[in-house]
Regions:
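Walker B catalytic motif
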Residues: 174-178, 185
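ABC-family P-loop ATPase nucleotide-binding domains
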Residues: 91-171
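The feature captures the beta-strand-to-loop junction immediately N-terminal to the Walker
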Residues: 36-38
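ABC ATPase NBD Q-loop/coupling interface
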Residues: 62-78, 149
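Conserved structural motif at the start of ABC-family nucleotide-binding domains
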Residues: 5-7, 20-22
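Conserved beta-strand-loop-alpha-helix hinge in the C-terminal portion
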Residues: 225, 229-252
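Helical segment within the ABC ATPase nucleotide-binding domain
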Residues: 187-200
Length: 275
């Protein structure tokens, strides 16, 4: 049986405001899915909910990983089980080298029963694999000696996330706006890198609002999110249509979701004004 990450009728609130309103999606290993939609439609909320961010309250619905209840797992256990999220805005960790961070993260994922203080992956083995992955992704060796995201450009942050994904080898990877803030060349490089480390063993959900990141990652399925729900699913041609024509047809076809989208945007502006 093919392994899968299955989301069923998922409802999520943030600060008591409903964001996701019944999301259904199943991602199987070896598949690439694109989740597209206007800004503020709830795309990133789905990624955070999958990984168990405490600020995102799941009010109903389920997420299962190969039939197991993912929502019953702590966030670190979800990562150990093979689920990975590349953040839209990853945090910096001054004083912690990329190589040290990756060695700890890789050890914890590959040895899920390891306790704090127990030995890490042997240094020689780790360095060999890290060197191979960095060469594959065309990343300068000096990168591993820098502090995690400290002073990184937007492109460097995204490459650090992709390198982490390459080392952890998750079963399922959620890439949240990996193309955000990148120029055309950086997006193309990120797209190529994702394609190189994905393959038949990894299910990938690419969260984006345009199709540039899909240049080397043709989606098996394209989902459109509007007003906190997936309103339409198609193939790669749907992603191309959205890139060329925008979301006017989608809003006209799903007026209830469009009204919810407008309300969500108004609520978002009110929260920003208060903050």
């Amino acid at each position: 049986m093919t392994e899968s990450l299955k989301i069923t009728d998922l409802h999520v609130s943030v600060a008591d405001k409903p964001i996701l309103r019944g999301v259904n999606l199943e991602l199987r290993r070896g598949e690439t899915h694109a989740l597209m939609g206007p800004n503020g439609s709830g795309k990133s909320t789905l990624g955070y909910a999958i990984m168990g961010h405490p600020g995102y309250e799941i009010t109903s619905g389920s997420i299962t990983l190969n039939g197991q209840d993912l929502l019953a797992m702590e966030p670190n256990d979800r990562a150990k089980a093979g689920v990975f999220l590349a953040f839209q805005r990853p945090m910096s960790i001054p004083g912690v080298k990329v190589s040290d961070f990756l060695r700890h993260a890789t050890t914890n994922v590959r040895r899920p029963d390891r306790k704090e203080g127990e030995e890490l992956i042997p240094m020689r083995e780790f360095r060999k694999e890290l060197k191979e992955k960095m060469e594959q992704l065309r990343i300068d060796p000096e990168f591993a000696r820098r502090y995690v995201n400290d002073g990184f450009s937007g492109g460097e942050m995204k490459r650090a996330e992709i390198l982490q994904m390459a080392m952890l080898r998750p079963k399922f990877a959620i890439l949240d706006e990996t193309d955000s803030g990148l120029d055309v060349d950086a997006v193309r490089l990120a797209s190529q890198s994702i394609a190189e480390i994905g393959g038949a063993e990894m299910g990938i959900l690419i969260i984006t609002h345009h199709d540039k990141l899909l240049e080397h990652n043709t989606p098996d399925y394209t989902h459109v999110m509007l007003g906190g729900r997936i309103v339409e699913t198609g193939g790669p041609e749907l992603a191309a249509e959205l890139h060329q024509r925008g979301y006017d047809r989608i809003r006209a076809a799903y007026p209830e979701a469009a009204a919810e989208e407008a309300a969500m945007q108004r609520d978002g502006k009110k929260l920003q004004a208060v903050g």
